[in-house]
């Protein structure tokens, strides 16, 4: 960490800023039971993957199936609620006050994020930039999204800290050469601890000073 240069905090969205993972798990569990009954807990199995990755691995056939699932998913997302993870709003406010640059770096596309903005229009002003799947070529676990976030914010990777909950996201942060703080919201603390500099249950009582301690 270079103490003379700015710090950036890069937040994944689902499972880090908002608690949507249980809702997505229900949706994908239903699809798994219908199309892949041989895979138990299908919703958990595909966590952290983009829609393109899910389609490529599990829904190549029959023709038209991907379009049908996309329509169903868009309809489902219109009914979803985007509840903030405990403590994240206050934590982001504190980081802003301390001069930390903030970005949301998500595997979600622009259409999905538009649904979140309808419920939380303040999201766009809580951070300096939002990197979605529509702005990158490679999905997590490729580090492109986090490297792009750092570039847009003008912060060196050594001064960036990533907040992630999924295995793919944690791997992407590590491959970007950044410190990763894991959120034990989607996976257990034990499951992600080895790949994270620190694991927290949520942002309750988490502070700028604690975050800075991870960077040093």
Located regions from the model:
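Asp-based, Mg2+/Mn2+-dependent phosphohydrolase catalytic module
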Residues: 1-7, 93, 109-110, 115-216
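Short, flexible loop segments at the rims of nucleotide/cofactor-binding pockets, characterized by
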Residues: 78-83, 107, 176-177
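Active-site neighborhood of HAD-like aspartate-dependent phosphohydrolases
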Residues: 2-44
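Short helix-capping segments at alpha-helix termini
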Residues: 33-38, 64, 97, 121-126, ...
């Amino acid at each position: 960490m270079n103490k003379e240069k700015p710090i950036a905090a890069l937040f994944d969205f689902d499972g880090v800023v908002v608690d949507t993972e249980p809702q997505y798990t229900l949706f994908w569990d239903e699809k798994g039971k219908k199309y892949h009954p041989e895979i138990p807990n299908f919703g958990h199995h595909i966590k952290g993957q983009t829609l393109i990755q899910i389609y490529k691995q599990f829904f190549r056939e029959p023709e038209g199936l991907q379009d049908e699932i996309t329509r169903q998913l868009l309809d489902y997302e219109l009914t979803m609620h985007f509840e903030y993870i405990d403590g994240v709003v206050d934590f982001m406010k504190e980081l802003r006050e301390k001069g930390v640059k903030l970005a949301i770096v998500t595997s979600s596309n622009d259409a999905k994020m538009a649904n979140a903005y309808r419920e939380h229009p303040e999201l766009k002003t809580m951070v300096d930039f939002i990197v979605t799947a529509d702005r990158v070529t490679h999905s997590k676990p490729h580090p492109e999204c986090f490297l792009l976030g750092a570039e847009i914010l003008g912060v060196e990777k050594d001064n960036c800290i990533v907040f992630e909950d999924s295995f793919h996201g944690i791997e992407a942060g590590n491959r970007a050469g950044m410190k990763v703080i894991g959120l034990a919201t989607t996976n257990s603390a034990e499951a992600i601890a080895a790949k994270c500099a620190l694991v927290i249950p949520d942002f309750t009582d988490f502070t700028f000073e604690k975050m800075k301690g991870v960077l040093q």
